[in-house]
Amino acid sequence: VIVGVPSYNAKFMFVTSEIEITGDAITTDDVNNLIKASVYSKVEQDYELITVLPLTFLIDGEKETKVVGKTGNKLEIKGIMISAPKKNVYSVLSVMEGAGLEVVDITVSALGDYYEVRNNNLDKNIGAIINLGHETTNVSVFSRGKLMNTETIQLGGINVDKDLAYMFNINVFDAREIKEKFASSHKRFIALNDVYEVKNTAGEVIKLNQIEVTEIVMDRLAELLRLAQKQILLLTKQNISYIVITGGLTEIRAFKNLVYEIFGKDVI
């Protein structure tokens, strides 16, 4: 299997290297040696190399896309080295090994987010992907299909659950069900007469209406989206052409209406 490791505290470094071509044509081994040379002595001691994303290959100073099989004297690469804390990597590997699965490669979760939604239009532009996860929210910036930077916000769907549990004195499992099946993401899109009955921690049956539930959910979701919006501005100074939002929280009723209110309508 190929596993994705958490993106938090991942580091991105611009790298470059060049090698002399000794054979008749450039081989896969030449490319592998070039990439290895580009990261030599650049990975910090408590970090693990994840991948190198090539930005440009050059043969004798001329840009090329597919270099294997071509001829030349000097091969050069310019790319982005991605490394992650060893604890992020080994914690995931230990789980996979415990499940009896053989790990053949590792990647950062942000790359997986991109390849889930990738298309020709995204490959040509600069944009951001926001993954609203259970415990964390990952914000990643891509330039023409290349991951340029990523950051993790330590808030996610579980915080919505905890907000509901605290405000209504209910357990977090009931809170999660209310979030998924009853709440709306925006107070303009609610059913005024809908009521949800649930037992609180004292064993009493209470009745919740959509207005009070949605106000709590909307406040937390708006906070998450605004933090993600701010993080995009911190990750890149370039104008972005798209924002993709993924994750379980996007399934809450009227989520797109809240997104449009905060980001505008250029959101997938």
Give the location of each predicted region.
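Nucleotide/phosphate-binding catalytic cleft detector across ATP-hydrolyzing
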Residues: 1, 5-127, 147-148, 171-172, ...
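Residue-level signature of catalytic and energy-coupling elements of molecular machines
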Residues: 3, 96, 131, 164, ...
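A short acidic Gly-Thr/Ser loop motif
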Residues: 5-6, 129-136, 142-145, 154-158, ...
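Residue-level detector of high-confidence beta-strand sites
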Residues: 150-152
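A conserved active-site cap/scaffold subdomain adjacent to cofactor or substrate pockets
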Residues: 154-173
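Glycine-rich phosphate-binding loops at beta-strand->alpha-helix junctions
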Residues: 186, 239-262
